[in-house]
């Protein structure tokens, strides 16, 4: 089941008195624990989130996209609203984070990415045109910029300190209902979801109700601090069934800072191009027949990634087209998601051990990771 997308930089930074990062490093102010509505000294089963909601809601916006489309019997394309989601103001000068699938554009023949027109509706109802600074399909995040006064940036929390069972609050605009709050608990802090080509690595799972339109909204702790960006729900019906997911704010910080500075998120890459459609299917008879016709042998592995081409750091390593990637840093690689899990915490320049199959032999090499030149 496809979770992501199933629901729904220009140089604006002044050189004067601007921090390098949108997300400042430091310890955020803690306003204290949410008030228990049960006077019993034992752990209370419910909490009062009124203060948390008051702090977070003004920073959550509605995000509407408009595309030019031509209807039946129409000679010309007209602009229509084609999708909606939520977003979170993370900087008082107009930086908003939302989901990639909410505002994703398309790539032209010359490689230029074209984005739809995006309009943001603020907490007070004001509508403002937004510019897409950049998107990151790997994390399902996108960054917008708006020009407006008196914006309230949400306070940032720390997703690395989250614990299972901790109370959280989802804020967004589900099903067209603006400024909606739902409450639940953290069900898992490092949930891996191998969906789509990239998958969700170490996401936050919660039972707080997340419905269509919540995508890109805020997941907050009991103090109203941002701990995650709501991404999707695992439901075949498209309605909340108590399983929602969010991208940890610690990851969002890096992605947003990269997009604002460079126009894209920076990732380390191994420099191999593989046939994604064959990933996880090397034991399939038709897949094996196809590969055998290309490499002219049939004794290749039944697991791993079939390498179509090499570039960057893998050039000269001994790895060639027709080889199979077996392990990275001791972790078996059978799908693109397996590879993403291993590479995500790595940095550009890190040296990693790679085990691969070449012409009937298993070999190992150390490769220094380089920066990805693409946005996927």
Identify the residue ranges that each predicted region occupies.
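Gly/Ser-enriched beta-turn/beta-hairpin loop segments
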Residues: 69-80, 108-111, 123, 133-139, ...
């Amino acid at each position: 089941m496809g979770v992501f997308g199933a629901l729904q930089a220009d140089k604006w930074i002044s050189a004067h008195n601007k921090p390098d990062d949108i997300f400042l490093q430091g310890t955020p102010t803690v306003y204290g624990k949410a008030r228990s509505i049960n006077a019993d000294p034992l752990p209370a089963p419910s909490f009062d989130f009124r203060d948390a909601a008051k702090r977070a809601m003004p920073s959550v916006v509605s995000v509407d996209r408009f595309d030019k489309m031509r209807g039946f019997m129409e000679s010309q394309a007209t602009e229509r609203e084609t999708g909606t989601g939520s977003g979170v103001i993370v900087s008082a000068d107009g930086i908003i984070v939302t989901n990639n699938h909410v505002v994703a554009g398309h790539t032209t023949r010359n490689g230029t990415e074209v984005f739809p027109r995006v309009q943001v509706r603020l907490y007070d109802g004001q509508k403002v045109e937004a510019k897409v600074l950049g998107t990151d399909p790997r994390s399902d995040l996108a960054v917008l910029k708006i020009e407006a006064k008196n914006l309230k940036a949400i306070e940032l929390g720390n997703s690395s300190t989250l614990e299972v069972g901790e109370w959280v609050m989802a804020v967004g605009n589900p099903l067209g209902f603006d400024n909606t709050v739902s409450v639940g608990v953290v069900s898992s802090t490092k949930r891996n979801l191998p969906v789509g080509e990239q998958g969700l690595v170490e996401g936050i799972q919660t039972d707080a109700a997340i419905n269509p339109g919540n995508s890109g909204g805020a997941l907050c702790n009991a103090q109203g601090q941002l701990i995650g960006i709501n991404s999707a729900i695992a439901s075949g019906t498209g309605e909340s069934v108590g399983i929602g997911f969010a991208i940890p704010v610690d990851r969002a910080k890096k992605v947003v800072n990269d997009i604002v500075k460079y126009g894209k998120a920076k990732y380390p890459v191994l420099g191999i191009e593989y046939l994604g459609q064959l990933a996880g299917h090397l034991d399939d008879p038709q897949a094996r027949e196809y590969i055998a016709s290309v490499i002219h042998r049939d004794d290749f592995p039944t697991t791993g990634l079939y390498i179509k081409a090499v570039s960057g750091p893998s050039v000269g390593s001994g790895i060639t087209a027709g080889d199979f990637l077996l392990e990275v840093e001791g972790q078996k690689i059978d799908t693109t998601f397996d590879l993403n899990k291993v590479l995500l915490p790595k940095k550009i320049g890190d040296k990693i051990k790679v085990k691969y199959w070449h012409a009937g032999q298993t070999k190992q090499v150390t490769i220094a990771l380089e920066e990805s030149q693409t946005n996927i």
